[in-house]
Amino acid sequence: MEVIQPTTQIFADNEKTVSQVAEEISSNELRETTVYLPDLFVSFCSRAPKTNPYYAEVKAESDAWFAKLYSLSTEKELSRLTKADFALFAAWWTADAGKSEFRTICDWCNWVFYFDDQFDEGHLCEDEAKAQREADILTQIMTVGLRDDEYPDDLPRARALRYAFRSVWERISQRASAGVQRRFREAMQEFCKGLVGQVGVRADIDTRELDPYLAFRRQSIGVVPCIVFAEYYHDLRLPDEFFEHPSVKTIMDLAAEITVLHNDVLSYHKEYEMGAIHNIVIILRERGMTQQEAYNETDKLIQKRLREWHLAVNQLPFYGEALDLQVQKFVQACQEVAVGNLHWSFATERYFGNQNNLIRKTRQVELIDLKA
């Protein structure tokens, strides 16, 4: 009768134990079901953001104010607001803002994410005419004002969002220079244009050329209003000609595009499940790339923009000591919006749930098999 040797002896010639082979099998299976995110924490995004010292206090105040105004009453609704932690997002790109200015920015952050939801998943996502009307009302608030009794038949939460924005705008108007007010107004109009544009072209957006597509996407990402807020809380007094300089426009565009690309990498799983189309990774996979190839290609787009950033900074104009100090604060603020957004995306459970810290460490995420 044949004698069966102990299992460990079977692998003696290869000097591998059962546990070692099991580890190899497990490792192979892992490689087949996971892929690696790009290393997004590079260049200026490698530094950890500072936190506004008023973060905890103002978060509690702002969340309570918005929850009451927007009638968030269920445990699920309140938990969503608290866990999203939009105040932390703000705290990481406004570390030097005073309490009053930081409160205004936190209120805007709470407002903007719920306002954006109307266009992404809410009652405006399939109705371009109603989406445009909502954008027009926002412009009305910043130009001729909005009375409490206007549009009484609209949805209560839509009206609540308008009044929240009106409150923010009134606080900005009381403190900011005419130039900051104008740039904020223009930034918000561009933001709304991007939101409405996404509603209108969901089915037929031309994604063949990525650079024009990213130019389209940067409108709706909301980065430029954040940059204008830096002028607001730093009380910058830069001349209008500064904002017309090509390098300044390039820096602002790049800050927005880097943020878009970061978000698209991190939100891919969530947006794929939702059936979203406005995501670079989704677009690249539709072109035949694997998930890893799409991540790698997106990483190249990010690195290209980081290199362009440094070139643009080197072309900034000089104005003398006093104004050049303000220029440096402005440039740093543009960086901090992208840095803060990236770190916040991993600090909360927005994209990866309770696996956020592990994925931040390993960069390994689940491989998605495309649906037929």
From Swiss-Prot:
Is-annotated flag, keyword Nucleus?
A: no
UniProt motif DDXXE motif: location: 116-121
Q: Where does Mg(2+) 3 bind?
A: N263, S267, E271
Record: residues binding Mg(2+) 2: E121
Query: SUPFAM superfamilies, from UniProt?
Result: Terpenoid synthases
Q: Which Gene3D superfamilies match?
A: Farnesyl Diphosphate Synthase
Going by the UniProt record, its keywords in alphabetical order are: Lyase, Magnesium, Metal-binding
Cofactor stoichiometry and binding remark: Binds 3 Mg(2+) ions per subunit.
EC code(s) of this entry? 4.2.3.-
Per UniProt, where does Mg(2+) 1 bind?
D116, E121
**What is this protein's function?**
Sesquiterpene cyclase; part of the gene cluster that mediates the biosynthesis of penifulvin A, a potent insecticidal sesquiterpene that features a [5.5.5.6]dioxafenestrane ring. Within the pathway, peniA catalyzes the first step and generates the angular triquinane scaffold silphinene via cyclization of the linear farnesyl pyrophosphate (FPP). The cytochrome P450 monooxygenase peniB and the flavin-dependent monooxygenase peniC then catalyze a series of oxidation reactions to transform silphinene into penifulvin A.
Name of the protein in question: Silphinene synthase peniA
> Which species does the entry assign this protein to?
Penicillium patulum (Penicillium griseofulvum)
Phylogenetic placement of the source organism: Eukaryota, Fungi, Dikarya, Ascomycota, Pezizomycotina
